[in-house]
Amino acid sequence: LLNIWYAHKMAADEDSESFDMDSVKFQSNVPDEVYIERIKKMNSFITLPYNEIVKNYIILYSEKMPTKMSHMLGLCQYYMPIFEETFNKYDLPEELKAMAVIESAMNPLAVSRAGAKGMWQFMYSTAKMYGLHIDSFVDERLDPVKSAEAAAQYLQDSYEIFGDWNLAIASYNCGAGNVNKAIRRSGGKT
């Protein structure tokens, strides 16, 4: 029922404006120093940079799309405990649960232009590799619990391969092969 509510609510409340995040540069009355200080205070297992891209996304979600942000925060209250339990089972950093916000804006029915589906944005082949059932009636990529389990397994595997959370996260987004290519192109520097 939550999936159906989300689809209808987000369709009805869609922000009238869409943004090309590659070319837009938002302005805010909040000084950069405030954002920088808040990011520094966050306890994280990875380095959190602050740059124009990060600033743009902070402004987008906090100032340009407050309704969507409110919906995402509401969904987080429901789904994050499920993700925490799953990620704890795999002894993963709990902060990785926030990847569902980045991947899909907490939309269990999200579909990317490339064909990735669900909250955790699994491509068909990767979903099958991690045991998600997909046929003409069922697509477990759209199941937040089962896809979170697959995401945790993928992240654990990626961390075992790369030994670095930044690379494991990059691998989740673009695939291990592309991360390996980038490492080779950089002369082994990460």
Q: What residue ranges belong to the model's regions?
A:
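An acidic, Gly/Ser/Thr/Pro-rich helix-cap/linker signature
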Residues: 1-90
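Substrate-binding clefts and substrate-entry loops adjacent to catalytic sites
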Residues: 57-71, 106-116, 121-167, 182-190
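Solvent-exposed, polar/charged alpha-helical surfaces in well-ordered, non-transmembrane soluble domains
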Residues: 74, 81, 85, 97, ...
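Membrane-interface junctions
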Residues: 89-92, 161
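Short, functionally critical alpha-helical segments immediately adjacent to catalytic or ligand/cofactor-binding
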Residues: 92-109, 168-173
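Active-site-adjacent helix/loop patches that line small-molecule binding or acyl-intermediate pockets
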Residues: 176
